[in-house]
A protein has these predicted regions:
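Short secondary-structure junctions
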Residues: 15-23, 82-87
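Intrinsically disordered, low-complexity regulatory regions enriched in serine/threonine/proline
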Residues: 1-2, 6, 10, 27, ...
């Protein structure tokens, strides 16, 4: 499983296009080619207890249409040193 490293301030995700939802997560909207269509998915970083556990997950993901965008976004986070692999 992939997760955001414990020492990462979640505000760093905003540099990569994620927006904060006051409840408990940051999300990045993955659009199909037409940004104005209702064809979209979310790449979500979930922050349980807002600080202790941060995991990367998908919500409403149509992997057939948005797989490449999702993988590229996760790759960007890995390259920036924000993500680590952990045993689930």
């Amino acid at each position: 499983m992939l997760k955001i490293k414990d020492n990462v301030d979640l505000k760093e995700l905003e540099k990569y296009g994620f927006t904060y939802d006051e409840d408990w997560y940051y999300d990045f909207v993955l659009y199909n080619e037409n940004e104005y269509s209702k064809d979209y998915s979310y790449l979500v970083v979930i922050a349980h207890n807002k600080e202790h556990y941060k995991e990367i997950g998908f919500d409403y993901v149509d992997l057939e249409k948005h797989f490449q965008q999702a993988i590229e976004k996760i790759y960007d986070l890995i390259q920036a040193g924000l993500v680590e692999k952990v045993d689930s």
